[in-house]
Amino acid sequence: MYNIKSRQAEEFINHQEILDTLEYAQANRNNRPLIESLIDKAALCQGLSHREAALLLECDEPELVQRIYRLAREIKRKFYGNRIVMFAPLYLSNYCVNGCVYCPYHAKNRTIPRKKLSQEEIRREVIALQDMGHKRLALEAGEDPRNNPIDYILESIRTIYSIHHKNGAIRRVNVNIAATTVENYRLLKEAGIGTYILFQETYGKEHYEALHPTGPKSNYAYHTEAMDRAMEGGIDDVGIGVLFGLNTYRYDFVGLLMHAEHLEATFGVGPHTISVPRICPADDISTEDFPDAISDEMFCRIVAVTRIAVPYTGMIISTRESEAVRRRVLELGVSQISGGSRTSVGGYAVPEAKEEDSSQFDVSDRRTLDEVVSWLLDLGHIPSFCTACYREGRTGDRFMSLVKRGQIANCCQPNALMTLKEYLEDYASSETKEKGIQLIREEMEHIPNPKIRAIAERNLQEIGEGKRDFRF
């Protein structure tokens, strides 16, 4: 039976409720008055239920789809403006004991070189990332209790935060590791992580078990209930997501929204971020083996309806996606992207030869961080390297309250401009710097509070004189 507040996976992600939702959406896909009423409801920026969102996703009337896209753009601008947060993944180890059939890290893969970074190698990786201009990382590691124990992750976090090369600093470390215990989540919280990220992969239990035949990750309930344990352990910023293409997109879309609803109903705060990766080629993995892979157009629609349904959440895409797709979804709801990414272990300090490739997936957008920043500036976006909310205690329900009331821009806009100024001074090419300075000049006029604007102007001047790390 469906129970949004249950702590049991098969009740808050209830199979029958998903089937009933899909049946409802299919039955009403041509019910124009109902769909229009839902678009009007969504325009109030209070979100939609999983059932309502499923109907919008099912709608294929061109005029209504364009209305959905326009609304997604408006909601994204209302909550997140034209700011795009930048981050990079850092792969610590690809040792893994699981048997996930879609991931090249699976235990039976004998062709991929296995690597685990030492603390000195992590130091070199972080310096390389700092020299690009990154301030925010997402740590990635395979699940292997012997090679990648929690103590290794904690030591790695301490190492990363300790490194300050030239003007560089990693100010926020998000962590994407396997489902673990409440006690281990407490340890991660004490280590100062930002967001704990864990993708469900697919919400269909039968599909999940078929895709994860061996290893600790094969336990559907333990994996699905991980975010509950993380929040019990004191982590109030969590990031969820599915790997679209493993199961039918309709099923996983509904499951994703039900998970967000469960977290909000149970803990008073929904997911800090929602990621929307798609299955893509990798070592010994072919997308031809996954018949549920989705088109670019459907991917864009999923992003748009997710933004409408969960207006407060940050939305993330990686360099799995091409430049063209990333451009479209930035307008439709995405608020965070990676840039200059390497998905191999140790790939920043010493790029690998193809025959030694330890990547988790093939990268589609291979541009440097400076090229991505320049591109965002050309599109009128503000590339933001801000990590202030985490360091000022604006996390969990405090952060969400500010976002939902539309007040987060009072902090985010000046912080984005100040961190962009740092990037331009320390790392940008001359062409990117020129464009960025012009955009900062224009965007300063859009800060409505004259007191905040005056402080930001003074801080920008001091950044130009060599000072760093101002924040509201």
Question: Can you name each region flagged by the protein language model?
Answer:
Residues 80-81, 85-121:
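Canonical Radical SAM [4Fe-4S] cluster-binding loop centered on the CxxxCxxC motif
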Residues 88, 126, 154-161, 185, ...:
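Generic structural signal for well-ordered alpha-helices
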Residues 211-217, 288-292, 358:
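Short glycine-enriched, charge-decorated loop/helix-capping segments at active-site entrances
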Residues 141, 195, 200, 221-285, ...:
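Conserved C-terminal portion of the radical SAM core fold
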Residues 1-37, 41, 324-332, 341-472:
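Radical SAM enzyme core and accessory elements
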